[in-house]
């Protein structure tokens, strides 16, 4: 699942992820959508923007996804300060990927997410 409030970035992420051979089950533009989609689609992992629009926090959403649905996140951010990173670490992230996204770093993060699953990863 992709959780990104900027539609063009979300579309770019979907192209990258599917190009790496993964399936994207849903794209959410807010924390509330992410939680609803997680209940409906049960993704293995979520690409989560740290700062979502409309006052949504990607970190808080990640906590809910982990607690309610056991979905771990790969955090995406253009500006990840130490305090934000520390807050995100409390939610057992798979990895952090800086924006702008370098495809090879995203691919490595997805591979890291796959290792414990030992099956196809659905985003």
Predicted regions and their residues:
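Acidic catalytic/metal-coordinating carboxylates
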Residues: 30, 56-60
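Two-component/phosphorelay signaling modules centered on CheY-like receiver
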Residues: 6-26
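Hydrophobic/aromatic residues positioned on beta-strands within the core alpha/beta folds
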Residues: 76-77
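C-terminal output helix
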Residues: 83, 101-111, 118
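Alpha4 helix (beta4-alpha4-beta5 surface) of REC/receiver domains from two-component response regulators
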Residues: 80-98, 108
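Acidic, metal-coordinating helix/loop segments flanking the phosphotransfer/catalytic sites
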Residues: 27-45
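Active-site residues of response regulator receiver
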Residues: 49-51
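Short amphipathic alpha-helix used as the core "switch/output" element in two-component signaling
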Residues: 59-71
């Amino acid at each position: 699942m992709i959780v990104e409030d900027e539609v063009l970035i979300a579309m770019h992420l979907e192209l990258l992820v599917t190009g790496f051979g993964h399936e994207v089950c849903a794209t959410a533009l807010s924390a509330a959508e992410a939680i609803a989609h997680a209940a409906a689609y049960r993704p293995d992992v979520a690409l989560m923007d740290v700062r979502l629009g409309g006052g949504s926090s990607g970190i808080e959403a990640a906590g809910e996804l982990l607690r309610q649905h056991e979905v771990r996140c790969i955090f995406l951010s253009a500006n990840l300060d130490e305090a934000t990173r520390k807050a995100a670490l409390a939610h057992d992230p798979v990895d952090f990927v800086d924006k702008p996204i370098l495809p090879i770093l995203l691919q490595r993060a997805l591979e890291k997410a796959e290792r414990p699953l030992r099956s196809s990863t659905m985003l």
